[in-house]
Design a protein with these regions (language model features):
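N-terminal active-site beta-alpha-beta segment that forms phosphate/nucleotide-binding
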Residues: 1-87
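Ordered, amphipathic secondary-structure segments that act as subunit-interaction surfaces
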Residues: 80-100
Length: 100
């Protein structure tokens, strides 16, 4: 695994470890989020973690189902407890930047 992939995996796992039982979790799209979903799936199996994921894309919904993450919609649960997504850049002031 490359250094960049290892850093994304670590970030994803750390984000997933912030999720608590009963939370509604926004799930973005991309490699870092997919690592977070991998870890959430592990926690669901090993700890009995009970969460509901709200995916931002069809691809994310498919991956979440593969990891055993129960899903809901933003229409049914418009208030999320936490959202996990990646960022293209972070400024020194900790602002996230998107590069189209």
């Amino acid at each position: 695994m490359s250094d960049a992939a290892a850093a994304k995996r670590d970030a994803g796992f750390r984000a997933a470890d912030m999720v608590k039982d009963g939370m509604f979790v926004g799930l973005g799209t991309g490699s870092t989020v997919f690592f977070a979903m991998e870890r959430l799936g592990e926690r669901i199996k090993s700890e009995g973690l009970r969460i509901s994921g709200v995916p931002t894309s069809y691809q994310t919904a498919q991956r979440a189902e593969e990891y055993g993450i129960p899903l809901t919609t933003l229409s049914l649960h418009p208030k999320l407890d936490i959202a996990i997504d990646g960022a293209d850049q972070v400024s020194p002031e900790a602002f996230l930047k998107y590069k189209p």
